[in-house]
C-alpha cells in the first residue's frame, strides 16, 4: 500500500509466532556465524506501537499526539508513527531534517526546544516550520531577526520536583514572568499562539498535569488580554511507557481529561496536543546482548555456602554494551536492568551472586549488580525488555561500539490496522473498530477495541 511504511521495512510475524521467537532465531544465527565478532541488536515490535496509539486515542480523545523524535529516531519508528498520522516534535535542525526527509509536512512539525541556535530558527523559517517554543527574551530576539512570521508557544515552568528527570530548572518561565514576555512579544510583533509545559519524566503525581493545565489557563488569559490569539495548548511529555510504572497512563489521562473539561472545555477553540516519546517506544524494543568475558571471584570465607545453596563466589560478566551506550538509563534514570535468560534454568541449577559490566575500561560502567544467576558462559545472550527509549543510536566509537542493528517486526493484524488507517485518511471514511490484539509481543494478551481512527489535521 502507499504510505510511509511498506512491508519491506519489517518482518511480518504470523499468528502464533512472537517477536520473542524471532529474537531467539536471531541470537541462534549470530551464535553460529563464522565471525568471532558479535554485537548487541534490537528487535522492535511495531505492532506494540500501533496498539499504544489506539490506547492513546481512546484515553485522550481531545489530544493530538506528537512524537518526540529525540526519544528514538530510528526509521521504522518514524515511519509507523507517520503512517498513524502523528505530528512530530523536534528539538534541533537534524531532527527537523530527518522527519521532513521521510515526507512529513511542515504543518505537522513543532520545534519544541525553547533555546535554539539561530541556524535552527533559520532552517525552520526556510522550510515552512511555523510553530516554535520559547521561554526567554533572547529567544524572542532571535525569532524577530530570523523568523518573524513564526507562531510562538510560551513554555511555562512546572512543579516537577517529584519527577525522575526534572526540566523546570533548565526550561520554562515562571508565571510571574509570563506577562513581561507576552508584552515583549507584542511589542516586537511576534505572534504568541499558545502555552506549553513539561512535568518531567517519571512523575508519580498525575495532579501535576492538572496544576500545569490550570496555570496554562492563566497564561492564556494574559495573552488574550494583550491581544495574542491563543489557541494552542501543549501538554508536553513525561507519560510512562511501561505497564509497571508507578502511575498508569490511564490514571494520568483521567486527571488530564478532568482538568481539560474544567479549564479548556470542549468547543473552546483550543487545539490540544502532547509530545510523547517513552510512551510509544519503550515497551516496543527488546535488546539481546552477548557475554564477551567472565571471571569468578571467590568470597572472603572459603567453604562458606549461601543460604540458597550456592557456593561462595561471585561472577563478573562483561557485556558488549554498557552504561555509555544503550544502558545509559542506569546513569540518568537510576534504573537497574534485569536480564532475561534465553534458556530458563532448571530448579536444580545453583545460583551465583553476579554482576554485569559494560566494555568501558573504567569502574563506572556497571550495568547491574546484586543479581542471582545460574552459571553463564562467554557467547551466551542476555535479553532486556523495555529498551526503546533513549537507546537507539547510542553507540560509543571511543569504546569501540557502534549503534545496534534493529530488526523490525509486526503482526499481520497490526499491519491490516495500518492499512485501514491509510484508507481512512485517503477516503475520509470511518474505519471499523479494531478488536484484536495488535501487538506481536509476548507480553500483550489483552485485546483492544476502539472507535474510528483519529488522524490529526494540520497544527496550523
Curated annotation (Swiss-Prot):
Residues 117-140 are annotated as: Necessary for polyamine uptake stimulation. It comes from the Eukaryota. Expressed in the neocortex, thalamus, hippocampus, cerebellum, medulla oblongata, gray and white matter. Expressed in neurons, oligodendrocytes, basket, Purkinje and pyramidal cells. Expressed in spermatocytes and Leydig cells of the testis. Expressed in luteal theca cells lining corpus luteum cysts and in hilus cells of the ovary. Expressed in primary and neoplastic mast cells (MC) (at protein level). Highly expressed in brain. Also expressed in testis. It is found in: Nucleus; Cytoplasm; Cytoplasm, Perinuclear region; Membrane. One of its GO terms (cellular component) is mitochondrion. The N-terminus domain is necessary for its localization to the ER-Golgi intermediate compartment (ERGIC). This is Antizyme inhibitor 2. It comes from Homo sapiens (Human).
Amino acid at each position: 500500500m502507499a504510505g510511509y511504511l511498506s512491508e519491506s521495512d519489517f518482518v511480518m510475524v504470523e499468528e502464533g509466532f512472537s517477536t520473542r521467537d524471532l529474537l531467539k532465531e536471531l541470537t541462534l544465527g549470530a551464535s553460529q556465524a563464522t565471525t568471532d565478532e558479535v554485537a548487541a541488536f534490537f528487535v522492535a515490535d511495531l505492532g506494540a506501537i500501533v496498539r499504544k496509539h489506539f490506547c492513546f486515542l481512546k484515553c485522550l480523545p481531545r489530544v493530538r499526539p506528537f512524537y518526540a523524535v529525540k526519544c528514538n529516531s530510528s526509521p521504522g519508528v518514524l515511519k509507523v508513527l507517520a503512517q498513524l498520522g502523528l505530528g512530530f516534535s523536534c528539538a534541533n535542525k537534524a531532527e527537523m531534517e530527518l522527519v521532513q526527509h521521510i515526507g512529513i509536512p511542515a504543518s505537522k512539525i513543532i520545534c519544541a526546544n525553547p533555546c535554539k541556535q539561530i541556524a535552527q530558527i533559520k532552517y525552520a523559517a526556510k522550510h515552512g516550520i511555523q510553530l516554535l517554543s520559547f521561554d526567554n527574551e533572547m529567544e524572542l530576539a532571535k525569532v524577530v531577526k530570523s523568523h518573524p512570521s513564526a507562531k510562538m508557544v510560551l513554555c511555562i515552568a512546572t512543579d516537577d520536583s517529584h519527577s525522575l528527570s526534572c526540566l523546570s530548572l533548565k526550561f520554562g518561565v515562571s508565571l510571574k514572568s509570563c506577562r513581561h514576555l507576552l508584552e515583549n512579544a507584542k511589542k516586537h510583533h511576534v505572534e504568541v499562539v499558545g502555552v506549553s509545559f513539561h512535568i518531567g519524566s517519571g512523575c508519580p503525581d498525575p495532579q501535576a498535569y492538572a496544576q500545569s493545565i490550570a496555570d496554562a489557563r492563566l497564561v492564556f488569559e494574559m495573552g488574550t488580554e494583550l491581544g495574542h490569539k491563543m489557541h494552542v495548548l501543549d501538554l508536553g511529555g513525561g507519560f510512562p511507557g511501561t505497564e509497571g510504572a508507578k502511575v498508569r497512563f490511564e490514571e494520568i489521562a483521567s486527571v488530564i481529561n478532568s482538568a481539560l473539561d474544567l479549564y479548556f472545555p470542549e468547543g473552546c477553540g483550543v487545539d490540544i496536543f502532547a509530545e510523547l516519546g517513552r510512551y510509544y517506544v519503550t515497551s516496543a524494543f527488546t535488546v539481546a546482548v552477548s557475554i564477551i568475558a567472565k571471571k569468578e571471584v571467590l568470597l572472603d570465607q572459603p567453604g562458606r555456602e549461601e543460604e540458597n545453596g550456592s557456593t561462595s563466589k561471585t561472577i563478573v560478566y562483561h557485556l558488549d554494551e554498557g552504561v555509555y551506550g544503550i544502558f545509559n538509563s542506569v546513569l540518568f534514570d537510576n534504573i537497574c536492568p534485569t536480564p532475561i535468560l534465553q534458556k530458563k534454568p532448571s530448579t536444580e541449577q545453583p545460583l551465583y551472586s553476579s554482576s554485569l559490566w559494560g566494555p568501558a575500561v573504567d569502574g563506572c560502567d556497571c550495568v547491574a549488580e546484586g543479581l542471582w544467576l545460574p552459571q553463564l558462559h562467554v557467547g551466551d545472550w542476555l535479553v532486556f525488555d523495555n529498551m526503546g527509549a533513549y537507546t537507539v543510536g547510542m553507540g560509543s566509537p571511543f569504546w569501540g561500539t557502534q549503534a545496534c542493528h534493529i530488526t523490525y517486526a509486526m503482526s499481520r493484524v497490526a499491519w491490516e490496522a495500518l492499512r485501514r488507517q491509510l484508507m481512512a485518511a485517503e477516503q475520509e471514511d470511518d474505519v471499523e473498530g479494531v478488536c484484536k490484539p495488535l501487538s506481536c509481543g509476548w507480553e500483550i494478551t489483552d485485546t483492544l477495541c476502539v472507535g474510528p481512527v483519529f488522524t490529526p489535521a494540520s497544527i496550523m
